[in-house]
């Protein structure tokens, strides 16, 4: 189970939502909220950032990027909806976007992982919800800023 920080509501523009139909959006956001026991606004932000992350992958096919823990929750949810995910990948990327946690560990070691992903998103004019990429962290808790296997895959080793 993922724990979400409880704070005052944050107004974040959902700029990537248009990459999928309203019906698919509703299905994915509801799935995340239910499965992770979180409030809908946070589930919406997670899904929006997941779509932005996947768009980045499509825009930069020769590079590999690392999702944050929170974005990985959205990616896992999308992967569970195979038809919708496959259609999205074909439409946005021209081919399937694979999720490879092992590859993510190599990226983290080579490029700085999430920090580099956020830089690339901004460079490609993809809106970044900073809280989902930084404040909730992607580190293993020892303070050195390095990701570990469980954080690269969304925490607790689920689904890897």
Regions found by a protein language model. Give the residues of each.
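Acidic, Ser/Thr/Pro-rich intrinsically disordered cytosolic tails and loops
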Residues: 2-160
């Amino acid at each position: 189970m993922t724990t979400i920080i409880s704070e005052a509501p944050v107004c974040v523009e959902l700029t990537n939502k248009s990459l999928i139909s309203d019906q698919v959006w509703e299905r994915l956001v509801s799935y995340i909220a239910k499965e992770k026991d979180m409030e809908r606004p946070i589930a919406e932000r997670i899904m929006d950032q997941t779509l932005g992350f996947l768009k980045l992958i499509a825009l930069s096919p020769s590079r590999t990027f690392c999702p944050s823990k929170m974005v990985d929750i959205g990616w896992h949810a999308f992967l569970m909806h195979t038809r919708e995910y496959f259609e999205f990948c074909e439409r946005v990327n021209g081919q399937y976007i694979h999720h490879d946690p092992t590859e993510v560990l190599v990226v983290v070691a080579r490029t700085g992982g999430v920090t580099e992903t956020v830089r690339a998103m901004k460079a490609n004019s993809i809106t970044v919800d900073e809280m989902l990429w930084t404040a909730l962290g992607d580190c293993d808790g020892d303070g050195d800023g390095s990701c570990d296997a469980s954080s690269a895959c969304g925490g607790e080793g689920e689904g890897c």
